[in-house]
Amino acid sequence: MRERGGDWKMEQLRGRIISRGKGEGEALTTTQPISFYGGVDPNTGIVIEKGHQLQGISVKGKILVFPQGKGSTVGSYTLYRMKKNGVAPAGMINRECETVVAVGAIISEIPCVDKVDISKIKSGDRVKIENGTVTLL
């Protein structure tokens, strides 16, 4: 919940649906693009890209908030493998989703939304994604 004029209210952000579904969890945010192929360990869900803001942190069960993906198209299948291994994020929110993340979210059935002002979401926030709506709880 966010404090607005002395009251606590839920804030809702509307975005574009990339992958339908519902996900809820703690936000894990970065201002850097993410490469799932080679940047995230598909067996543990830990970001392994050297120098990345999230290096050493697990995305498992988190609402992963990042500007966009980057890297190889194999990243889509890395997301799928993460889902099968039980270490995928509970949902993803992008400023601008690109093909690799979109395909990975869809085939893995991970809720994903883009066209959202991701600067409003901070690591540790409780977040719910339901289709095109992002709710900060």
Place the predicted regions along the sequence by residue.
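Short, Lys/Arg-enriched N-terminal segments with co-localized hydrophobic residues
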Residues: 2-9
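Feature captures the catalytic cores and cofactor-binding loops of soluble hydro-lyases/lyases
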Residues: 11-23, 28-135
